[in-house]
Amino acid sequence: MISENVKLINSKIIEPVFIDDNVVIENSTIGPHVSIYKDTKILDSHVENSIIGKHTQVLNAQINNSMIGNNCKYDGNYKSINIGDFSELI
């Protein structure tokens, strides 16, 4: 399910996915098996088999089998990672 007010710019979505309200995805590939919660930005990334919390930024990432919490900022190339709420990994 993809919410109506998701902004997709030059990106590919591979179902099944859940993408919540006010998400921006740019120059990225998302899916399969990805959940992205509200007010999150994903730029220049590839995300699969992962959960990304609300109010989070994912930049320049290649992630798989990962969980990123709420209010996080992630800029990196770890392939599998779990990050708690209010974390920064840049």
Residue ranges and their predicted role:
Residues 1-90:
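Left-handed beta-helix
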